[in-house]
Amino acid sequence: MSQNSEFHDDNALLDIHDRPKPLAWAGLSLQHMFSMFGSTVIVPLLVGLSPSIALFSSGIGTLLHIMITQRKIPAYMGSSFAFITPMLALMKTTGYPGIAQGVVSVGIVYLIIAAIIWAVGSNWVDKILPPIVVGPIVMVIGLSLAGSAATDAMMKNGHYNLTYFMIALATLGIAIFCNMAFKGLIGLIPVLLGIVGGYLISMALGLVDLHAIAVAPWFKIPAFEFPGISYPFKLNFGAIITIAPIAFVTMTEHMGHIMVLNELTHRNFFKDPGLNRTLAGDGVASLVAGLIGGPAVTSYGENIGVMMITKVHSVYVLIGAAVFAMIFAFVNKLNVLIMQMPLPVIGGISFLLFGTIATSGIQVMIDDKVDLSKKRNLMIASTTLVIGIGNAYLQIGQFQFTGLALATIIAIILNLVMPQEAASEKVIKSVE
């Protein structure tokens, strides 16, 4: 795995600093924007925030992250699901002013941890995150989302719907076909084409509210929420304590996504540009989101999945996606058009995106020749997978470690405390 910023991955169609041609650039960037759109706007819709502000926050957050990480990490920032529960609670009591302080505090926590890591270094990362830990965690990142993908693909108002599932399978089929059968631009944007195909099928079946699209105004300025301007600022320690601790949970998810990107791009981003910069980028993105009325943001697995499928890792494509997201926040009709995207379309494409992430975890262990016949490795992998995919959680008061975060912590602890060989394996060796 290279730590040299001049390294070029010839296995990628476009490596991190390669710039695509204009038409391909637009198509590839739109593909990333469409892939993250559903998840990014569902968070504010559930909480009662503005989807347009969330979209703008994701775009500006991505640009800030790319700038802070010196254009070395192709990551997209979208609305984080980890904060939904506390934000819902605060919306009922303090309204957005309390949520804003909580989101800003999340960014500050990230920046404090980034400063500590900058001071003490990150050599410890290799010790606590060997392939036997990284592989299963990456698999959990993909597989823990499988239930969500299946629900979107099959369920309508809590009941199984065959039409939905057929649309999901058609969306998946179109993406797979375009990826396998075509070269050139079409072969580079299978996810986008799958989404468009599924959308058109849904439209033909009457699942898209065309009237809402028709009556929507073309342009609309998002109702940004600025502290001291849109609402009076008053420090709320209760709101900060409610949201800020969850930053430690999302940090583990952040590190998991960086692990996936390390394997995907054959680099070590923990070393270059450094874990301190990746955390600082995430922190600044959330801090800015809180100051303009958006939810906390985090790196998105959907966009990592797109990169795996297309082998396009260009940071410029992510920059384009961020710019499109910021523009779409003001183009209300296009915003409404995408918000009308049926769930089975999202579910169908998610089968592919989340599946590719999971299989990359398997590839991590294969590449490092991890021996699962060794009891130590088997115990770590098995425990991590079931806890993570089963979404087990540890709750202490209002503080909760769920799924991926808990699995990551347990995997790290097991790796640090378990001996290299079980007693029975030592006996076998002595006999031999």
Protein language model regions, located:
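Intrinsically disordered, low-complexity non-transmembrane regions of multi-pass membrane transporters
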Residues: 1-27, 210-228, 263-270, 277, ...
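N-terminal signal-anchor module of multipass membrane proteins
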Residues: 1-77, 82-95
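Membrane-embedded helical hairpins/re-entrant loop segments and their flanking transmembrane helices
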Residues: 8-23, 45-66, 242-315, 429-431
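Juxtamembrane interface elements at the cytosolic ends of transmembrane helices
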Residues: 9, 37-41, 171-181, 189, ...
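Hydrophobic, membrane-embedded alpha-helices of multi-pass small-molecule transporters
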Residues: 23-36, 162-171, 189, 221, ...
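Short, non-helical or kinked segments that cap or interrupt transmembrane helices
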Residues: 49-55, 71-83, 125-134, 186-192, ...
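Interfacial segments of multi-pass membrane proteins
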Residues: 87-92, 179, 303-318, 324-328
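Membrane-embedded alpha-helical modules
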Residues: 93-211, 320-429
